Amino acid sequence: MQKIAIITDSSCDLTIDEIKDYNLNILPLKIIYKDREYNDIFDIKPIDVYENLHNEVPTTSLCSPDYINSVLDKLEAEGYTHLIGIFISSSLSGTFNAARLVIEERSSFKYYLFDSKIIGYPLGSIVIKAAEFVKEGKSFEEIIEALSIIREATTGFYTLNTLEYLRRGGRIGKVAGTVGDLLHLKPIISVDEHGAYTTIAKARGRKQSLKKLASIILEHLDEGKCNVAILNGMAEEEANQVLDSISSHPNLLKSQVRAIGAAMGVHAGPGMVGVSIQKEI
């Protein structure tokens, strides 16, 4: 009999309650200050990062091999036979490869590792769907086969108050930097086919960028039924405004407003508003 574990990283931006409810195993990114470090999700909250930005902008790093091994030891002791790992885009983080190197050395599990080529709650929504399939009793092979379909149905878009934090983290990629700030152009950011950040649209000023974000959501809803999560980093009021502007669409299934996690907050900075869209599967 298959006993399947789902493992992911903390960039999925799931809550502690969701992690418990879906029996997920999390590899936390590290949030590092000059004199201290924290495990994302478990040891630090986004508000802690934002309130300290004027003193110090932290960095993030990968979960350690020792921590990954401790998670695997626990799963082995609990009798898990199969492992499905669903991780942040390998173009944005070394987490996928770090996990792969450790898991490949273990003979206890039959495993499958999936590079989501996405980040944040869009990743989290893929993880939740996979965990639901585990609860439903689907087989290891069925879930693996479904992952590409779930990923194809899932997308995310973001707009930031400033690109400063994305630049500091070295993850700005194809996203236009200095010119955008100088001209008050706000890029709408997504990921390309390789899972790297890219600009898919620009708007002049904050108000127009939020309108553009809403119009992108409506375009997806026009194509079919979707679950939508509006994401924010210390911008809940604006996130609710975006949700209000799309809430009457007949193809909107479930909708919610969610806060991004601490590690995401390090790179997005305060004021990020985004969206996770998942087509009906």
Curated annotation (Swiss-Prot):
<feature type="binding site">
    <location>
        <position position="93"/>
    </location>
    <ligand>
        <name>hexadecanoate</name>
    </ligand>
</feature>
<protein>
    <recommendedName>
        <fullName>DegV domain-containing protein CPE2509</fullName>
    </recommendedName>
</protein>
<dbReference type="GO" id="GO:0008289">
    <property type="term" value="F:lipid binding"/>
</dbReference>
<dbReference type="InterPro" id="IPR043168">
    <property type="entry name" value="DegV_C"/>
</dbReference>
<dbReference type="Pfam" id="PF02645">
    <property type="entry name" value="DegV"/>
</dbReference>
<dbReference type="InterPro" id="IPR003797">
    <property type="entry name" value="DegV"/>
</dbReference>
<feature type="binding site">
    <location>
        <position position="60"/>
    </location>
    <ligand>
        <name>hexadecanoate</name>
    </ligand>
</feature>
<comment type="function">
    <text>May bind long-chain fatty acids, such as palmitate, and may play a role in lipid transport or fatty acid metabolism.</text>
</comment>
<dbReference type="InterPro" id="IPR050270">
    <property type="entry name" value="DegV_domain_contain"/>
</dbReference>
<feature type="domain" description="DegV">
    <location>
        <begin position="4"/>
        <end position="279"/>
    </location>
</feature>
<keyword id="KW-0446">Lipid-binding</keyword>
